[in-house]
C-alpha cells in the first residue's frame, strides 16, 4: 500500500532522515519506534506532504505522493493525526469532526462516516456538543482520531498518540488503536512507548539519528537485544 524508497528529508541545512526505506501493506499495523529527535515525526510529515523530501520516492497504492499537492494527499486515502492532537479547542466535538470530512467523497458520506466514528468511540457521541478543549486528554485523542477517520482513509497515520497522557489514559489509547485495527483499517503509528506499541502492531521499524537501525515483526523486535537494552530496560 505505502512504499518509501531512499527518502532523505530535513529542515533548512539540518538533515533529519537518511535513506529511509519503509513499507506498509494493506491491513497491517506498523510501528515506528525510537528516541526523541530520531526523525519519527519528520517521517510522518513527509508521508502526509507537510515536508517535501530532498530525495527519494513515496507511493501510495502506486500513486506518486510527491507530485500530489499536500491538500490533495488526503484524496489518496492518507489521514494524519498529528502529535498533540491539534484540535480546534473552542469548537464543539461535532464541528471538529466536520473538519475531517472536507473532501467531496467524505461530504457525500458524512452521516455514514459519523456513525462509524460514534460506533468506534461512543463517548464522542455523548460529548458531541461539548467544546473540544474542555475534554480530558484521552477524549481529545478520540476526537482527533475521529476527525481523521471522517475522511474515510485507507491509511491512518498516528503520531505519538499517547504523548502527554496519564498512564491509565495511555492504556485506553492503545485500546482505541486495537479497535481501529479490528475495523480493518491500515495503521502506521509513531510511538515512544515501545512496550505498548509492540503489543498492537504486526511489524515495527526502529529509527535512530534519522536512519532505520532495525525492523521486524513485533515478536522479533521484542526479542531484539538492541530494543530490549535501549527501550525496554532489560
What name fits each language-model region?
Residues 12, 30, 68, 93-112, ...:
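ABC-type ATPase nucleotide-binding domains, specifically the catalytic core motifs of the NBD
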Residues 148-149:
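ABC ATPase C-loop
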Amino acid at each position: 500500500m505505502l512504499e518509501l524508497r531512499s527518502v532523505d528529508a530535513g529542515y533548512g541545512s539540518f538533515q533529519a532522515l537518511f535513506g529511509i526505506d519503509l513499507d506498509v501493506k494493506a491491513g497491517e499495523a506498523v510501528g515506528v519506534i525510537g528516541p526523541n529527535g530520531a526523525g519519527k515525526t519528520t517521517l510522518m510529515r513527509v508521508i502526509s506532504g507537510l515536508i517535501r523530501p530532498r530525495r527519494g520516492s513515496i507511493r501510495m497504492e502506486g500513486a506518486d505522493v510527491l507530485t500530489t499537492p499536500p491538500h490533495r494527499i488526503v484524496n489518496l486515502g492518507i489521514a494524519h493525526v498529528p502529535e498533540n492532537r491539534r484540535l480546534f479547542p473552542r469548537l464543539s466535538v461535532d464541528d471538529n469532526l466536520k473538519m475531517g470530512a472536507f473532501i467531496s467523497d467524505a461530504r457525500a458520506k458524512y452521516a455514514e462516516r459519523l456513525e462509524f466514528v460514534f460506533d468506534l468511540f461512543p463517548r464522542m457521541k455523548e460529548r458531541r456538543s461539548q467544546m473540544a478543549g474542555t475534554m480530558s486528554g484521552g477524549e481529545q485523542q478520540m476526537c482527533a482520531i475521529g476527525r481523521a477517520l471522517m475522511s474515510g482513509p485507507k491509511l491512518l497515520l498516528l503520531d505519538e498518540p499517547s504523548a502527554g497522557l496519564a498512564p491509565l489514559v495511555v492504556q485506553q489509547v492503545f485500546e482505541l488503536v486495537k479497535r481501529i485495527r479490528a475495523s480493518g483499517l491500515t495503521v502506521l503509528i509513531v510511538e515512544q512507548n515501545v512496550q505498548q506499541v509492540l503489543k498492537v502492531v504486526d511489524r515495527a521499524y526502529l529509527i535512530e539519528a534519522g536512519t532505520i537501525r532495525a525492523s521486524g515483526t513485533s515478536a522479533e523486535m521484542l526479542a531484539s537485544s538492541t530494543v530490549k537494552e535501549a527501550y525496554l530496560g532489560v
